[in-house]
């Protein structure tokens, strides 16, 4: 029986980074919300979302949202101040 234990949770988002430093973050859909996913961990849907929406070649499902590593410099990821509010939040 598989169980997912989350001892502590933290919200990770990108506001800015040093020049040359790799940028990571949650993929954002057309509604400006994070892209939801399941199952956790390695996830083909997240790999696709990260490639198409963040210019990243590595993504996985973390806390039920697609998280992308080493995204392109021009990519807008969740938490970016220029993004605006998620349109599905009411």
Swiss-Prot record:
Segments crossing the lipid bilayer: none
Superkingdom of this protein's organism: Eukaryota
Signal peptide positions on this chain: 1-22
SUPFAM superfamilies, per the entry: Scorpion toxin-like (SSF57095)
Keywords (A to Z) from UniProt: Disulfide bond, Ion channel impairing toxin, Neurotoxin, Secreted, Signal, Toxin, Voltage-gated sodium channel impairing toxin
Family annotation (InterPro entries): LCN-type_CS_alpha_beta_dom, Scorpion_toxin-like, Scorpion_toxin-like_sf, Scorpion_toxinL/defensin
Tissue specificity: Expressed by the venom gland.
Disulphide connectivity of cysteines: 33-86, 37-61, 46-66, 50-68
Alphabetical list of PROSITE patterns matching this protein: LCN_CSAB
Location(s), subcellular: Secreted
GO BP annotations, alphabetical order: defense response
One GO CC term on file: extracellular region
Domain LCN-type CS-alpha/beta: 23-87
Comment text on domains: Has the structural arrangement of an alpha-helix connected to antiparallel beta-sheets by disulfide bonds (CS-alpha/beta).
Similarity field: Belongs to the long (4 C-C) scorpion toxin superfamily. Sodium channel inhibitor family.
Function, in words: Putative sodium channel toxin.
Protein name, UniProt field: Putative sodium channel toxin Ts35
């Amino acid at each position: 029986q598989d169980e997912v234990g989350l001892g502590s949770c933290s919200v990770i988002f990108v506001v800015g980074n040093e020049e040359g430093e790799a940028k990571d973050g949650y993929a954002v859909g057309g509604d400006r919300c994070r892209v939801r996913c399941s199952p956790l961990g390695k996830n083909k849907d997240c790999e696709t979302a990260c490639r198409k929406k963040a210019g990243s070649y590595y993504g996985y499902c973390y806390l039920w949202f697609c998280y992308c590593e080493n995204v392109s410099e021009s990519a807008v990821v969740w938490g970016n101040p220029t993004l605006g509010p998620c349109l599905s939040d009411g």
